Swiss-Prot record:
Gene Ontology CC entries for this record: mitochondrial inner membrane; mitochondrion
Name of the molecule in the record: Mitochondrial glycine transporter
GO biological process: glycine import into mitochondrion; heme biosynthetic process
Lineage of the species this protein comes from: Eukaryota, Fungi, Dikarya, Ascomycota, Pezizomycotina
Solcar repeats: 8-92, 121-205, 223-307
Function in brief: Mitochondrial glycine transporter that imports glycine into the mitochondrial matrix. Plays an important role in providing glycine for the first enzymatic step in heme biosynthesis, the condensation of glycine with succinyl-CoA to produce 5-aminolevulinate (ALA) in the mitochondrial matrix.
Length: 320
């Protein structure tokens, strides 16, 4: 019975993560495509000319959503794996005596003066679980990420994802499907860790403000959703600004692995050829996309989990 319950909850976290990831990736694909194009080369690609080029093409709408399938697969299943592993890590860490002792001063259990149904951890716990979960999910989804970047870019003339994958394996071997993983991990681990840290801190502070305004009454569902959305957007903006250089390097490595080789060589070449500015290429687009996608994904995920937790609690009462 316990195993069945845990399995169903794990499955639901996977489904909730998948749903939230698909929603954000499909809606915000144009911003992701523009970011990839802008990061190709700081000298030849800037935002306005890139937009004009796409809009002047025979199929502008299709052009803006080019690469939606690999992006949706990557973000959808990546989010599913990330949220599932993040929940497992947070649940496990929250149950240890050391974590409980560290988090005791800020933990309030499942109180609805919080906007979240997720376990409360210390700052280091939030940082570590976010980084580990994102790195693991990123490794599993790396081949899809490489396909997405190559397909979105105008460096290649791939007509389908199959032809892209076949060409990469033929010319670069299976290793080519993991191009840029070092830079991706260097970007995603600190980004995810910082994001979860900022997100939880912002939620806690905003929830305290909202609960005081509601005279100690439980938070309304609309208040919880608003708190999660605002916290997600702000946390993503902060974490994105800090880690953008890794994203710019990752894009170059995935587009031209033969030229750039590794992270250190890529950084040197980018600065030599395009200046320090190249490390911050696409920052505005990435902040916009990350803020919106994270706000949407985490709000949808948290809302689904809150509703599921309420139903599971009611079911447990009935079973008793």
């Amino acid at each position: 019975m316990l195993y069945s319950c845990l399995a169903s909850k794990t499955t639901f976290h996977f489904a909730a993560g998948l749903c939230s990831g698909l929603t954000s990736s499909i809606l915000l694909q144009p911003a992701d495509l523009l970011k990839t194009r802008v990061q190709q080369s700081q000298k030849t690609a800037s935002l306005l000319p890139t937009i004009k080029t796409i809009l002047s093409s025979p199929h502008p709408i299709r052009g803006l959503w080019r690469g939606t399938l690999p992006s949706a697969l990557r973000t959808g299943f990546g989010s599913a794996l990330y949220f599932t592993s993040l929940n497992a890590l947070r649940q496990g860490l929250a149950q240890t005596e050391a974590a409980m002792a560290i988090a005791a001063s800020s933990s309030d259990g499942k109180s609805r003066t919080s906007s979240s149904a997720l376990p409360k951890l210390s700052n280091w716990g939030n940082l570590a679980t976010g980084a580990v979960a994102r790195t693991a999910a990123g490794f599993v989804m790396m081949p899809v990420t490489v396909l997405k970047v190559r397909y979105e870019s105008d460096y290649y003339a791939y007509r389908s994802l199959y032809s892209a994958g076949r060409d990469i394996v033929r010319t670069e071997g299976v290793r080519g499907l993991f191009s840029g993983f070092g830079a991706t991990a260097a970007r995603d681990a600190p980004y995810a860790g910082l994001y979860v840290l900022f997100y939880e801190q912002l939620k806690r502070r905003l929830a305290l403000v909202a609960s005081s305004e509601q005279s100690e009454q439980p938070l309304k569902s609309t208040s919880s959703s608003s708190i999660n959305f605002v916290s997600g957007g702000l946390a993503a903006g902060l974490a994105t600004a800090i880690t953008n250089p890794f994203d710019a390097v990752k894009t170059r490595l995935q587009l031209m692995p033969g030229k750039y080789g590794n992270m250190i060589r890529a950084v040197r070449l980018m600065i030599r050829e395009d200046g320090v500015r190249s490390l911050f290429g696409g920052l505005g687009l990435r902040i916009t996309r990350k803020a919106l996608s994270s706000a949407l994904a985490w709000t949808v995920y948290e809302e689904l989990i809150l509703r599921a937790e309420a139903r599971w609690a009611e079911k447990d009462k009935i079973d008793l």
